[in-house]
């Protein structure tokens, strides 16, 4: 970089990095923390199709509004449409799902309003339930895969194989016109009665007209909600993601906390946040273009501040000096150990799930599962034949059927297989892994990653597998250099 004498060398480097595979990996880690991406959702199953879908969106540089819209309107089975994983993440908690959606994409912290009027923000419990009613036409079809497996079990296939086969076909997002939201039994306000049906209503912000909504076609409720939320006319949607990206680069958001933008006038610089919201709309929610603008600003290029001044807002004389994230630290170590070829090594377990999706219409009702019994076994037999012909199965009969679809992430990573970018490893890693020790999010709640550091991380850096591998790399490099020097000396003689 320093050898380059071009005046635009910095801008060129920014362009190069934003287009690199490493940036795609970095953005997946960032979104993984925001969207609570995990390999396995409780009672839902493996979500590898979601990982693959999200990475493809980043690779294609899909605009943020389109990406979010697709997640909110996704339909079908998890095994064939990875985007459904976003709604399936909180399938058993629809009110929490709405709360997380509003907090993540609009910076509207409405968690309190699930139980009572928000004490500090302009959100009532009625407002929350009226907004939640737009998810009322969404249902999550699932049946415990273990029970139908027992029903279907015979000598041809094991229970474990049937569970593996059924799971990607059982989890799906559908429209249910018979569903509706009602006020809770402990609703304590005079504007509605407990158990009363909620009439859908949009809650909008200043500068955006209240939408005309009809409930005659409940099928379109979620689509209407997603259209409104991601609309360029919705300033909160633009400002929320702009605020998040600003924090990613500067270490502190224009408005903190970034999950609560209800009082924008209290931001460190309200005019800056408004401008950033306009900017991201001007680039049509292209996250690469937006990041390119931020990274090329004189403000970002200024010397980093050690700590923000106490008792007053940060005026952004430059970014804050801060520790790298766990994923950035890990990826830097992996790059040292394995070199640039690391970006050519990808893990994709989605095909192992996608191949289990039934090629026929299937409704996950217990009685209908039994009716489809022979179809299911015929499909399983086809898969078994394919597996045996390609030597994927090491066992006879049906005992080893489909086991490769889950084995990849359960097997302990060894040797070079463990030195992959964080985005290619299990999401998240186990508690004892360096990534977790260094602050990787557990993905239980959004934005849970930490850059605080601590004694455990320091010890891991000095005495753990990372230190041993780095020292081994240094030793190998020194040995190679000595051999090269000896060879050169021998040639001269």
Give short role names for the model-derived ranges.
Residues 26-29:
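Conserved AdoMet
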Residues 1-22, 35-416, 436, 441-449, ...:
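Primarily short, surface-exposed interaction patches in extracytoplasmic proteins
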Residues 421-422, 436:
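Eukaryotic charged/polar low-complexity linker/IDR segments
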Residues 51, 426-429:
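A cross-family structural signal marking well-folded subdomains
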